């Protein structure tokens, strides 16, 4: 009956910019200047998790952070009407190992039912995934 307590952290820094200027009739791009940030890419992303593992079961609590990003190309601070604000979402997962071939799984996404935005295109603001739960059977041979 040995327990493990793994902890993980991850960070991603994504610094984007267009290296050429161009114009597009597509509404998603418009006129691009050299040095404009590419839309819909968060500069900062972070995730962390802590788990409790045993020979028969696993429990994991994880959190993920996505930084603010712009929805149109541009430089400097992001105007509110072209911004999707940062968000943090917490998830929970579990697994019970029935035998060496079968496990029962359970997952809760967005444990605290956080309301957050993920997009503005097309047709306005779009929410992220609300609270959801699932159960399943995993087979391994």
Each language-model region and where it sits:
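Residues that define the transmembrane beta-barrel architecture of outer-membrane proteins
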Residues: 3, 42-46, 86-90, 129-133
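Gram-negative outer-membrane beta-barrel transporters
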Residues: 1-73
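Extracellular loop and loop/strand-boundary signature of outer-membrane beta-barrel proteins
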Residues: 28-37, 76-81, 120-125
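Residue-level marker for the onset of beta-strands and adjacent loop->beta junctions
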Residues: 19, 46-47, 90-92, 102
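Short, glycine/charged-rich beta-strand-loop motifs at protein surfaces that mediate ligand recognition
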Residues: 77-84, 91-95, 102
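C-terminal beta-signal and adjacent terminal beta-strands/loops
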Residues: 65-74, 95-141
């Amino acid at each position: 009956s040995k327990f493990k307590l793994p902890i993980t952290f991850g960070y991603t820094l994504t610094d984007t910019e267009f290296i050429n200027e161009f114009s597009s009739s597509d509404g998603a791009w418009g006129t691009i200047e050299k040095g404009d940030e590419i839309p819909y890419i968060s500069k900062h992303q972070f995730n962390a998790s802590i788990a409790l593992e045993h020979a028969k079961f696993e429990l994991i609590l994880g959190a993920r952070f996505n930084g603010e990003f712009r929805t149109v190309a541009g430089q400097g601070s992001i105007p509110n009407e072209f911004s999707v604000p940062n968000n943090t979402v917490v998830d929970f997962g579990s697994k019970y190992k029935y035998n060496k071939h079968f496990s029962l799984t359970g997952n809760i996404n967005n444990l605290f039912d956080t309301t957050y935005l993920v997009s503005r295109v097309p047709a306005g603001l779009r929410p992220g995934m609300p609270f959801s739960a699932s159960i399943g059977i995993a087979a391994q041979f």
